[in-house]
């Protein structure tokens, strides 16, 4: 690990679209300059795919910095933790030769995801579908119900695992409530107390050595001159407050939550890097103004889907694909206060004869230049496009701006101009070395 260029200089990485922007690769690349990486929201519904020397590694809950020797990995209080999944992820990494337990620290304040959260999540989606209401598109991993318990002040937290009697009492009360919902409203089967409690006590013994006061550790890292990287999950347009509600996730995915979700002040967030695909994708339901049809071979949508290998890391579901939506990007820049952008998957556009970018919308006979807040209005939006000539040369693996095809550079320059934020990095392939650096987040 190289020394940080500026003592205590912290970087926040957030997705600016509907997730799957390629944050994992960028975080892994930036970790060269970080002493620690922090997850601050979401759960194991978030997939982070890293490709290192041609080998693909998929992470869901553990910070992407785990693939770098000597880097501390923190799971902040804003994350909901499924202990069984977490241990499974640890075991898979350690079986592959990655040391995890000595470097992973989990906030005691994290809410727990337990089996009844998963069952409620799945039963709700099934009920929505059968009633004709339409799915929200959750991953079915219990994330939403766990956050509901947190907000209702009844959640079991990681710290409760240290106190078996307290855990048992709270679990009985919580299980009674969720069984009432499962049986009475969702027409699903109730769960039994003993297996849930016994399993929790078993995993508790394995997790206890990794429990920590994450906020204090981050503060001490900065005081010692170390830099910290805050790794966001999902994307801004899935944020519970600022996304395309109700087709959103259950947490705040924006940069401001890096402070609240890890236990530090906002003054610790020095540089905000937004990750943006050179086009747009979305998994699951919800409005998507620049979406393209993908089924027909030879179409742009099919090209983006197949060349981009657009399937969800966690669910395996095909991602919906479309042109870059600069008007939606403007909303993300406004919310996050971005310092700079990293454009990913530029290489997927190689070979297209024409490239389009959504620069605004027509809504009820008027032109608007930023994504509306109302999901029904977004559905009614007709995108306004600018067109660009494509390029025939390959951008795969390019590491210098001047080596990009001229039309690729012109496209990126126009993206930068329309959205009003500087492009500081460009990703030209899945491997960490496939990166063009224009301004370093740890030096800018």
UniProtKB/Swiss-Prot annotation:
CDD domains: AdSS. The active site is at 20 (proton acceptor), 48 (proton donor). Binds 1 Mg(2+) ion per subunit. GTP binds at residues 19-25, 47-49, 319, 345-347, 427-429. It is an enzyme of class 6 (ligase). The keyword Heme does not apply. One of its GO terms (cellular component) is cytoplasm. Its EC number is 6.3.4.4. Its cofactor is Mg(2+). GO terms for molecular function: adenylosuccinate synthase activity; GTP binding; magnesium ion binding. One of its GO terms (biological process) is 'de novo' AMP biosynthetic process. The keyword Metal-binding applies. Pathway: Purine metabolism; AMP biosynthesis via de novo pathway; AMP from IMP: step 1/2. It catalyses: IMP + L-aspartate + GTP = N(6)-(1,2-dicarboxyethyl)-AMP + GDP + phosphate + 2 H(+). Mg(2+) binds at residues 20, 47. Keywords: Cytoplasm, GTP-binding, Ligase, Magnesium, Metal-binding, Nucleotide-binding, Purine biosynthesis. IMP binds at residues 20-23, 45-48, 139, 153, 234, 249, 317. Substrate binds at residues 313-319. SMART domains: Adenylsucc_synt. Belongs to the adenylosuccinate synthetase family. NCBIfam families: PRK01117.1 (NF002223), purA (TIGR00184). Plays an important role in the de novo pathway of purine nucleotide biosynthesis. Catalyzes the first committed step in the biosynthesis of AMP from IMP. This is Adenylosuccinate synthetase. It comes from Methylibium petroleiphilum (strain ATCC BAA-1232 / LMG 22953 / PM1).
């Amino acid at each position: 690990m190289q020394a940080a260029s500026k003592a205590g200089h912290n970087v926040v990485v957030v997705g600016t679209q509907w997730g799957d922007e390629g944050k994992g690769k960028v975080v892994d690349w930036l970790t060269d300059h970080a002493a620690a990486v922090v997850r601050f929201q979401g759960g194991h519904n978030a997939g982070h795919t890293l490709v290192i020397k041609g080998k693909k590694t998929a992470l869901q809950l553990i910070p992407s910095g785990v693939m770098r020797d000597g880097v501390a990995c923190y799971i902040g209080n804003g994350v909901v933790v499924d202990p069984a999944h977490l241990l499974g992820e640890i075991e898979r990494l350690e079986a592959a030769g990655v040391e995890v337990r000595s470097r992973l620290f989990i906030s005691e304040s994290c809410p727990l995801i337990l089996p009844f959260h998963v069952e409620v999540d799945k039963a709700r989606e099934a009920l929505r579908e059968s009633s004709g209401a339409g799915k929200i598109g959750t991953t079915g991993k219990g994330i939403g119900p766990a956050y509901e318990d947190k907000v209702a002040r009844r959640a079991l937290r990681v710290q409760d695992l240290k106190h078996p009697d307290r855990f048992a009492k709270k679990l009985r009360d919580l299980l009674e409530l969720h069984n009432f919902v499962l049986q009475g409203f969702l027409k699903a089967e109730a769960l039994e107390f003993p297996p849930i409690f016994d399993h929790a006590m078993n995993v508790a013994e394995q997790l206890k050595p990794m429990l920590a006061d994450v906020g204090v550790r981050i503060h001490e890292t900065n005081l010692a001159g170390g830099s910290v990287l805050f790794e966001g999950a999902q994307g801004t347009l899935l944020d519970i407050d600022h996304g395309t509600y109700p087709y959103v996730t259950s947490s705040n995915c924006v940069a401001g939550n890096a402070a609240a979700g890890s236990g530090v002040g906002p003054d610790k967030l020095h540089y905000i890097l937004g990750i943006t695909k050179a086009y747009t994708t979305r998994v699951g339901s919800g409005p998507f103004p620049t979406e393209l049809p993908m089924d027909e071979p030879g179409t742009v949508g099919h090209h983006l889907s197949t060349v981009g290998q657009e399937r969800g890391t966690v669910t395996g579901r095909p991602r919906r694909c479309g042109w870059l939506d600069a008007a939606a990007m403007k909303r993300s820049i406004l919310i996050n206060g971005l310092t700079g952008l990293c454009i990913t998957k530029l290489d997927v556009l190689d070979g297209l004869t024409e490239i389009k970018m959504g620069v605004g919308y027509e809504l009820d006979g008027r032109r608007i230049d930023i994504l509306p807040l109302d999901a029904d209005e977004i559905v009614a939006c007709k995108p306004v496009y600018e067109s660009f000539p494509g390029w025939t040369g390959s951008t795969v693996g390019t590491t210098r701006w001047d080596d990009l095809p001229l039309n690729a550079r012109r496209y990126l320059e126009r993206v930068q101009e329309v959205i009003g934020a500087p492009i500081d990095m460009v990703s030209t392939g899945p491997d960490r070395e496939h990166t063009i650096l224009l301004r370093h987040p740890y030096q800018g």
